[in-house]
A protein has these predicted regions:
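Mature, well-folded catalytic/scaffold domains that follow N-terminal targeting or propeptide regions
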Residues: 1-422
Length: 422
């Protein structure tokens, strides 16, 4: 059985085992293309936003942030400020990849008649004309037409026009949870190369299926479009918005969406995926979603936050998730990080919270990795937000937009609130 088939038939243990076997035997880009192909077949039956490509993006970034690994990552990632020990990072990277495959098998999938389409004609118009037609097709809710133009734009070696146009459209009305921007931005950063024909086509079908439902039929008043979509915009610094970003992490909202939205804005701003005035537009929407004034530095004092608002206690421990490499990760944490790991997994939230102000600089990589493990190796295999939020918060800390102590506190509180049994 192939990994793709295991995911679509709901074979959770099989999917985790197969992806584990592929490591070191297959090209990393092929592994990620297959996983994105499976993600594109996710049918979200309860809400309006499928999270399969969002969690794929988050786990891919988690693995990158844990350090280089040529068996799993196609390119060497930027050096992280928090360098995780190799004897922890490597099994944790593998376990995260296995957790992703497990999740993609656990979620709902389209029946073949209603899922992604592969036989779509593409027209050879100019790129600028194709970009305009792509936009108009989305606004007219004509998915197959939009897909045809997306395939044309995406077939470039560097599909910058597709990435930037999609991000701009997604920014117009991100909704009260930020989904409208979070999902397309996550998907576009994980778009497989057109060399992987079927995954490439399926992922763009998944994207256009979403955009025609979420993008406004008319551009909102006051929204500016960059007239140079053929190149990335200059990076935008968010250093002046640290209080808003930190507030989004403290007031993280339902399932952590405020923090996730903030991180996707920060990533798009840093990469130049959106222009500075689009960043401002998105930050304004984030502020509206939070619903409160940004907190001051004094209000965000970690000691005050711990005293002011206690975290949620567990009634019982969440179910553990067994993966080919989960045992190695747990064993490392029990043997080498017992103090932190035991406190994190205690039923009472305050047991770990009270040590956060005293965590030394050298221990932050362990705390971060332990929270990655806590989010991924516990709970339900269908759960996604616990992982997505954990990665988002630590990514903001990596960028220097929030303190490590705030990241650790709020990830811990979110996991205590939302990690459940199977």
């Amino acid at each position: 059985m192939t990994l793709f088939k295991a995911c679509l038939t709901g074979d959770e243990p099989g999917a985790a085992s197969l992806v584990s076997e592929m490591v070191s035997k297959s090209q990393p880009s092929a592994i990620w293309a297959i996983l994105m192909h499976a993600a594109a077949w996710n049918e979200q039956r309860d809400f309006d936003t499928p999270h399969s490509t969002i969690i794929t993006h988050s786990i891919h970034r988690m693995i990158q942030e844990l350090g280089p690994n040529s068996d799993i990552l196609a390119t060497k990632p930027p050096s992280s400020k928090l360098k995780t020990p190799n004897d922890l990072s490597e099994p944790l990277q593998k376990a995260l990849l296995e957790r992703l495959a497990l999740h993609l098998a656990a979620i709902d999938h389209w029946v073949s008649e209603r899922g992604p389409r592969y036989n779509v004609d593409t027209r050879l118009d100019s790129l600028d004309m194709t970009m305009g037609n792509y936009t108009q097709s989305i606004r007219k809710q004509a998915q197959m037409s939009a897909l045809s133009f997306a395939l044309r734009l995406g077939s470039r070696e560097d599909p910058v026009r597709l990435r930037r146009t999609t991000a701009s459209l997604a920014a117009e009305d991100p909704d009260s949870l930020g989904h409208g921007f979070i999902m397309p931005m996550s998907l576009m950063t994980e778009l497989p190369s057109s060399d992987y024909k079927l995954p490439f086509q399926a992922v763009l079908w998944h994207l256009t299926d979403y955009l025609v439902r979420k993008v406004p039929q008319k551009q909102p008043d006051g929204f500016k479009i960059d007239d140079q979509m053929d190149r990335m915009a200059p990076p935008t610094s968010l250093s002046k918005h640290k209080s808003l970003i930190a507030t989004s992490i403290f007031e993280y909202g339902v399932l952590g969406h405020n923090g996730i939205f903030a991180q996707r804005i920060a990533a798009a701003a840093k990469s130049g995926l959106v222009h500075s005035y689009t960043v401002d537009w998105l930050l304004d929407r984030l502020h509206q979603n939070i619903g409160t004034k940004p907190l001051t530095t004094q209000q965000l004092s970690i000691e005050k936050l711990i005293r002011k608002k206690p975290g949620t206690n567990w009634d019982q421990l969440p179910s553990g998730i067994d993966l080919p490499n989960s045992g190695k990760v747990r064993l490392w944490l029990v043997k080498s990080a017992t103090d932190y790991w035991d406190k994190m997994m205690d039923l009472e939230a305050g047991v770990f919270e009270e040590v956060i102000p005293d965590i030394s600089k050298k221990d932050w990589p362990i705390v971060k990795a332990a929270q990655y493990a806590m989010s991924a190796l516990n709970g339900a295999s269908r759960a996604s937000h616990v992982i997505i939020f954990t990665q988002a918060v630590w990514s903001l800390a990596e960028q220097g937009l929030i303190d490590n102590s705030l990241a650790a506190l709020q990830v811990h509180r979110m996991l205590k609130q939302y990690l459940k049994g199977r």
